[in-house]
Amino acid sequence: MAAAAVDSAMEVVPALAEEAAPEVAGLSCLVNLPGEVLEYILCCGSLTAADIGRVSSTCRRLRELCQSSGKVWKEQFRVRWPSLMKHYSPTDYVNWLEEYKVRQKAGLEARKIVASFSKRFFSEHVPCNGFSDIENLEGPEIFFEDELVCILNMEGRKALTWKYYAKKILYYLRQQKILNNLKAFLQQPDDYESYLEGAVYIDQYCNPLSDISLKDIQAQIDSIVELVCKTLRGINSRHPSLAFKAGESSMIVEIELQSQVLDAMNYVLYDQLKFQGNRMDYYNALNLYMHQVLIRRTGIPISMSLLYLTIARQLGVPLEPVNFPSHFLLRWCQGAEGATLDIFDYIYIDAFGKGKQLTVKECEYLIGQHVTAALYGVVNVKKVLQRMVGNLLSLGKREGIDQSYQLLRDSLDLYLAMYPDQVQLLLLQARLYFHLGIWPEKVLDILQHIQTLDPGQHGAVGYLVQHTLEHIERKKEEVGVEVKLRSDEKHRDVCYSIGLIMKHKRYGYNCVIYGWDPTCMMGHEWIRNMNVHSLPHGHHQPFYNVLVEDGSCRYAAQENLEYNVEPQEISHPDVGRYFSEFTGTHYIPNAELEIRYPEDLEFVYETVQNIYSAKKENIDE
């Protein structure tokens, strides 16, 4: 069935006839127009690919104008998929008709896979091997990514399940590509000092759905460099940095000339552009992402230092990164070239503190403690990235218990890409996956690796192995889908249905119901910890699985819920897993959820009619 759909869709682009049909009466006026005019008409944007295919079959002249590598099919491709044009060079020879067909086929294949995910993975997190279908597809990866982006950009509140799985697939594909790029980057020799490139890989990995590129970030930095040069020209119109061409630089030797650059930088960054250290919201991951530092013009010491360092080096000032405890710094050499230097031959720059220049003693005052000379030394790219990822790791551990721990998962991936044998972090990763109930097979692989690296971890490893194997066995024992019918006598007390927008009477949060039980199905410990016995109806009442607007999933007693008289969308990341559409008053379950609650939708319609229609009538009166 799916294959037939693909074949049918491919017929949208008719094959060009080997022999053009004889000229048809009425075409003579058209074909006698100058070629440029005909080409303009065919590229006007009103004609579809099918139209072009049919036009090209009418006569030899039109067929030649619609040749595969010409402007007509290029325009068809551009109009249909404009975001892909940046991947083509104006000098490249491209068979645009063939490119159109390949892109169309890739899109159909991508949609077929996205459509299959809900049925395959509704009851569990998408496993590690769940993305193998996408990885094994033939054709350019950018075409599949582009189709996924098209799905995510579909307008309106429909296709929520498609968007949910398209987002997961795109997230995975981009992260895999970025991680491979980062690993290749880390194999560069030690003298390869592109700190910005490494920082951008970290930014991209943690934000794979954002359009972040080194080229764009470098362009923004280049624009800052231009402003610095403008200021520098007012200080010293003959300054050698002004002669540097874009993308080229060399180091300036004279300290006075270097000082002029730093003065101009400080004026532009902190006075003109108003960059500043983020003291008010220091523990925010956005402070570590370079694209956000440039947008928000704020960051923490390490991200501000990397920006400052990049600009200074482009203008010929050889600053170096210093992995100073609690406060990342840059150092600026004041000694003669080739001389034996110690820590007192440097000035230390605090990019977080508006480019303030510090002595060794002032650095100690900055953090309130004495440190050894070794901590004033320069560090390589890998150590800088290690500190950035370490900061993200610390922030990830702060995430609330109801969150997906995505930042912690991403930062663990990045850290272990740099240091794959860190036993404690491997153990943390295994525990995290175990806690989230995802990827049990991967958990076993991690635990086996830990046991090989450090047999002394046998106790912790053994505990996790045992419980992970039990989890796998329970999954194997799971029978078919449990169907809950509202008409069943044991469900007579259930008042609400999946898809309804509710409000918690006590805590005031908004939520949507995605499941229910006739009585509380949690264990005794949970019931005791949540003080369920203090409720008037205790645990002998229906309980509802709800997605809450703060991103959490909760289990709420019926007596604590009420209809939300002002229903609104619930901005929960898992809404698309259960629902296909938001109507403005309620959510419509997707096919998989409806199988489990086949009678709920009819009840939802009745409830919406009674609650919201009555409200509208009262307002009209």
UniProtKB/Swiss-Prot annotation:
Domain of life: Eukaryota
Gene Ontology molecular function terms on file: DNA binding
Gene3D superfamilies for the chain: 1.20.1280.50, Hemimethylated DNA-binding domain
UniProt keyword list: Ubl conjugation pathway
Pfam families named in the record: F-box-like, Transglut_core2, YccV-like
CDD domains reported for this sequence: F-box_FBXO21 (cd22096)
Segments forming domain F-box: 28-77
Role of this protein: Substrate-recognition component of the SCF (SKP1-CUL1-F-box protein)-type E3 ubiquitin ligase complex.
Assembly behavior: Interacts with SKP1 and CUL1.
Protein name as annotated: F-box only protein 21
